[in-house]
């Protein structure tokens, strides 16, 4: 049984499912498009990589693979919060500018995450990894 793969899949899909449920309660509607929208609570990117790093540590210990996954997680989490959030804010500004000048723009722009969304996603990843490790 591949606990690493199970943990990562459960954390990623679990966070994405939580995001859909939160969206549905907030907007009282849901579409297929909403499954693939980036940004929002919680960060599935953070859940995914924190789960990966945690389960590797639990199964392998402090190995080179763990170190690699830790660096990978730091890059992904930083990207989810920093780079993608900045790009999302710029997308918002461009959309307003296009609207003011009656220009066409795409309906969705990729949003990054707030610190709270990243922390909650990370907690989900951590809990899922521990659950998979100790229950399977």
Residue ranges and their predicted role:
Residues 1-17, 25-28:
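Helix-loop-helix hairpins and the membrane-proximal interhelical loops
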Residues 13-20, 32-136:
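Membrane-embedded catalytic cores of phosphoryl/pyrophosphoryl-handling enzymes
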């Amino acid at each position: 049984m591949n606990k690493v793969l199970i943990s990562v899949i459960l954390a990623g899909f679990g966070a994405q499912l939580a995001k859909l449920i939160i969206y549905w309660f907030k907007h009282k509607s849901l579409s297929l498009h909403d499954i693939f929208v980036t940004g929002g609570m919680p960060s599935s990117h953070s859940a995914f990589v924190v789960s990966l790093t945690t389960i590797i540590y639990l199964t392998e210990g402090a190995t080179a693979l763990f170190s690699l996954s830790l660096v990978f997680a730091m890059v992904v989490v930083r990207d989810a919060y920093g780079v993608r959030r900045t790009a999302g804010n710029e997308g918002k500004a461009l959309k307003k500018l296009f609207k003011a000048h009656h220009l066409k723009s795409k309906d969705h722009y990729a949003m990054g995450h707030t610190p709270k969304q990243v922390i909650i996603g990370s907690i989900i990843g951590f809990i899922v990894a521990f659950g998979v490790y100790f229950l399977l």
